[in-house]
């Protein structure tokens, strides 16, 4: 109980320093919807609640003007940044599904082969590349008219490599407006 009071006091002091008047009315309305009650006054919990973030960010993206979105994002950065959660520079409304694209190619040659795969997924900020490049040796040898020869068996060696870049964001919204909701609940 005592910890909740301390957390609430910290939230209120951060919000006061931020200035509630800087938060557009449209964002205040969005923040009052769907607040994750399981978080209580835990700002970090609110700033990382995926379902809440999707709902509030979509609300701000569709109901606030570009200028109001900018002010809302700056406000959220001040609060969520204080607990180590990064907030993106824009409000996006996640789509119901995801889309992906990719390509693959293979170019065998007499000395070996190579292949590469590239793909991306939108809506979750995850991209990656997988490029295995195996090499192989074919039998080699020589022969004469007397039918003698030498050779070596075919061998294959390869070390597939994988490189990737996954944005270390909780989701596409990254805590964008969770701070606003925490403020609205704390002040209410």
Swiss-Prot record:
Record bears the keyword Metal-binding: yes
Cellular component, GO, one term: side of membrane
Protein name in UniProt: GPI-anchored hemophore ARB_01017
Lipid-conjugated positions (GPI-anchor amidated asparagine): 165
Species the sequence originates in: Arthroderma benhamiae (strain ATCC MYA-4681 / CBS 112371)
Topology versus the membrane: Lipid-anchor; GPI-anchor
Residues annotated as binding heme: 42
Family of the protein in this entry: Belongs to the RBT5 family.
Cellular compartments annotated: Secreted; Secreted, Cell wall; Cell membrane
InterPro entries in the cross-refs: CFEM_domain, Extracellular_membr_CFEM_dom
Domain writeup: The CFEM domain is involved in heme-binding and contains 8 cysteines and is found in proteins from several pathogenic fungi, including both human and plant pathogens. The CFEM domain adopts a novel helical-basket fold that consists of six alpha-helices, and is uniquely stabilized by four disulfide bonds formed by its 8 signature cysteines.
Residue ranges constituting the CFEM domain according to the UniProt record: 18-107
Domain of life: Eukaryota
Keyword annotations of the record: Cell membrane, Cell wall, Disulfide bond, Glycoprotein, GPI-anchor, Heme, Iron, Lipoprotein, Membrane, Metal-binding, Secreted, Signal
Functional description taken from the UniProt entry: GPI-anchored cell wall protein involved in stabilizing the cell wall.
């Amino acid at each position: 109980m005592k910890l909740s009071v301390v957390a609430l006091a910290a939230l209120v002091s951060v919000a006061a320093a931020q200035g509630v008047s800087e938060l557009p009315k449209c964002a205040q309305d969005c923040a009052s919807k769907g607040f994750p009650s399981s978080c209580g006054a835990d700002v970090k919990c609110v700033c990382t609640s995926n379902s809440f973030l999707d709902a509030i960010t979509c609300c701000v993206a569709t109901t606030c003007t570009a200028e109001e979105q900018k002010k809302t994002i700056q406000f959220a950065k001040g609060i969520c940044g204080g607990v180590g959660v990064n907030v993106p520079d824009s409000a996006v409304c996640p789509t119901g599904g995801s889309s992906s694209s990719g390509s693959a190619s293979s170019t065998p040659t007499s000395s070996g082969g190579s292949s590469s795969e590239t793909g991306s997924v939108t809506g979750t900020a995850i991209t990656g590349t997988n490029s295995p490049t195996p090499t192989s040796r074919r039998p080699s040898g020589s022969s004469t008219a007397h039918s003698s020869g030498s050779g070596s068996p075919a061998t294959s060696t390869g070390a597939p490599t994988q490189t990737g870049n996954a944005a270390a964001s909780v989701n596409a919204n990254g805590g964008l407006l969770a701070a606003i909701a925490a403020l609205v609940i704390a002040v209410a």
